[in-house]
């Protein structure tokens, strides 16, 4: 009986944790979803961004106390501007979706919203992690050996 309880708790923690992509699996998925070269942004740059924003974790969240917004999902898309979480004051919801959609293992909605973000004048510079960890750096390592 104890073994079943422990197994249940382990399975529950896996469900809450979400999908953490393997590097090459994510690279192939992003390529398939049209991210390689989207708005002139290389697949390696998208991979670097995802690495430093979420560690490739679809369920990553980060609360920002200053403006009471939250960053969601593999790209850490912010509820102040891009999605609706029902609790961020003055939210814009420019991607026209619920923030919970950004936490799914299927990242199609997250990719569509990230594409919307980079259509704004700031482009990929909207992400602080990209500016701090990827901009003007050799990011080839994020796709190396993935065959993409």
UniProtKB/Swiss-Prot annotation:
GO terms for biological process: defense response to Gram-negative bacterium; defense response to Gram-positive bacterium; killing of cells of another organism. This is Lysozyme C. It is an enzyme of class 3 (hydrolase). It comes from Gorilla gorilla gorilla. Residues 19-148 form the C-type lysozyme domain. The gene is LYZ. It comes from the Eukaryota. The keyword Transcription does not apply. Residues 1-18 form the signal peptide.
């Amino acid at each position: 009986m104890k073994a079943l309880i422990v197994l249940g708790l382990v399975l529950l923690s896996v469900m809450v944790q979400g999908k953490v992509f393997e590097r090459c699996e994510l690279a192939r998925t992003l390529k398939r979803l049209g991210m390689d070269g989207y708005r002139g942004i290389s697949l390696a740059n998208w991979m670097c961004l995802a690495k430093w924003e979420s560690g490739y974790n679809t369920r990553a969240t980060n609360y920002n106390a200053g403006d009471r917004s939250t960053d969601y999902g593999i790209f850490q898309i912010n509820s102040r501007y891009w999605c609706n979480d029902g609790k961020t004051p003055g939210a814009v919801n420019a991607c026209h979706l619920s923030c919970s959609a950004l936490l799914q293992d299927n990242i199609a909605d997250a990719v569509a919203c990230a594409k919307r973000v980079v259509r704004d004048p700031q482009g990929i510079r909207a992400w602080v992690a990209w500016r701090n960890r990827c901009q003007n750096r050799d990011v080839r390592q994020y796709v190396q050996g993935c065959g993409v």
